[in-house]
């Protein structure tokens, strides 16, 4: 019962780049999220709605409250806050949790526009911090510099939403090997190394990454 996603690395989608290639990789990964119930990608909104629905069901089942009761929304909001607060200690977790709370607020009040804004932010589609601050009250946007931290946050979140974890499949890693600039290759290799070290040191909980690469790219000592 995992959330899975994939990306095919290319000239336009890398770990690091000076033309938004890292953010493009992130956007593709979020766009390609899939679950058993939504196998054809685009599962992010389903995951969020399932999370909210599960918390609402807990309030119904264990507290005997029903939607429309004067304290029903209060109890669900408390559960939402408990989960989002638990993410604040992670890098960028405060803003991530705040956007999740905004999505729930939109669900609770019927404000579809607020939900769309939260989804836009989670998908890495905000271009300026000013716009994000105005729309969602957060001081951060997902960017080339921090996108991988948000993949780790998503891995934590999907477990809280009832899944076993997040699997990320990355194909065509040889694209990095083919970068003509030595500096560009090294930046991308260093990012790959940091991802590997996170896994080795237990800093990327509930996240599995599968990478495919050609034998030539693995064994060429010159690159």
Regions found by a protein language model. Name each.
Residues 1-161:
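P-loop NTPase nucleotide-binding core
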Residues 112-223:
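The catalytic "switch" region of P-loop NTPases
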């Amino acid at each position: 019962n995992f959330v899975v996603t994939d990306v095919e690395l290319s000239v336009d989608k890398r770990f690091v780049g000076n033309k938004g290639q890292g953010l493009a990789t992130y956007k593709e990964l979020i766009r390609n999220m899939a679950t058993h119930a939504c196998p054809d990608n685009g599962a992010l909104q389903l995951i969020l709605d399932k999370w909210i629905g599960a918390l609402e069901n807990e309030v119904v089942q264990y507290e005997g409250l029903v939607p429309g009761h004067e304290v029903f929304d209060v109890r669900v909001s408390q559960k939402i806050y408990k989960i989002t607060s638990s993410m604040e200690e992670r890098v960028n977790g405060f803003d991530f949790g705040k956007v999740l709370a905004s999505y729930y607020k939109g669900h609770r009040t019927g404000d579809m526009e607020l939900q769309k804004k939260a989804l836009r932010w989670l998908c890495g589609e905000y271009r300026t911090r000013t716009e994000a601050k105005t729309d969602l009250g957060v001081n951060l946007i997902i960017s080339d510099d921090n996108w991988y931290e948000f993949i780790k946050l998503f891995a934590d979140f999907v477990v809280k939403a009832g899944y076993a974890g997040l699997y990320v499949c990355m194909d065509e890693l040889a694209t990095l090997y083919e970068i003509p600039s030595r500096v560009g290759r090294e930046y991308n290799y260093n990012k790959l190394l940091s991802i590997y070290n996170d896994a080795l040191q237990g800093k990327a909980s509930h996240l599995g990454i599968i990478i495919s690469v050609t034998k030539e790219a693995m064994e060429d000592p010159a690159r």
